[in-house]
Amino acid sequence: MMAEEHTDLEAQIVKDIHFKEIDLVNRDPKNINEDIVKVDFEDVIAEPVGTYSFDGVWKVSYTTFTVSKYWCYRLLSTLLGVPLALLWGFLFACISFCHIWAVVPCIKSYLIEIQCISHIYSLCIRTFCNPLFAALGQVCSNIKVMLRKEV
């Protein structure tokens, strides 16, 4: 009985990961498009002082821009949204797969192999460079500099 409840709970957790509720009101909860895609009429078209068009033209232009942008986006998202979501899902799945099964193991392998080399390198530095720089430090420690200001 207890094992069945545990299995049901695991199945529920897996189901929740793949079928979570999405927010239809706030569709950018992490604000990834805050400054990039938000383009309004005033961001694109502006008339400097002294070169104004007729008020009616300005109002119709504003309405035309806003409505055409709105409906063009809706049309494009209707036609291309699902295929592009499929494409991006596939692409990020491939990237995740490569990262999990190729990149991380290569990095771990490299770190294991480089550890042996780093010990040898450290030994060489301590054996050859440390005495050399210590001797140079002793030689240069007796150098005295006097500054004299001549008037």
Curated annotation (Swiss-Prot):
InterPro entries found in the cross-reference section: Caveolin, Caveolin_CS
GO CC field: caveola; dystrophin-associated glycoprotein complex; endoplasmic reticulum; Golgi membrane; sarcolemma; T-tubule
Tree of life domain: Eukaryota
Chain intervals for the UniProt region annotation (Required for interaction with DAG1): 64-114
Gene Ontology MF terms: alpha-tubulin binding; calcium channel regulator activity; connexin binding; molecular adaptor activity; protein-containing complex binding; sodium channel regulator activity; transmembrane transporter binding
Cytoplasmic side: 1-83, 105-151
Keywords carried by this UniProt record: Cell membrane, Golgi apparatus, Isopeptide bond, Membrane, Ubl conjugation
PTM entry text: Sumoylation with SUMO3 by PIAS4 may reduce agonist-induced internalization and desensitization of adrenergic receptor ABRD2.
Single biological process term from Gene Ontology: nucleus localization
Cross-link Glycyl lysine isopeptide (Lys-Gly) (interchain with G-Cter in SUMO3), sequence positions: 38
Annotated S-S bridges: none
Function: May act as a scaffolding protein within caveolar membranes. Interacts directly with G-protein alpha subunits and can functionally regulate their activity. May also regulate voltage-gated potassium channels. Plays a role in the sarcolemma repair mechanism of both skeletal muscle and cardiomyocytes that permits rapid resealing of membranes disrupted by mechanical stress. Mediates the recruitment of CAVIN2 and CAVIN3 proteins to the caveolae.
Family of this protein: Belongs to the caveolin family.
Protein name: Caveolin-3
Organism encoding this protein: Bos taurus (Bovine)
Lineage: Eukaryota, Metazoa, Chordata, Craniata, Vertebrata
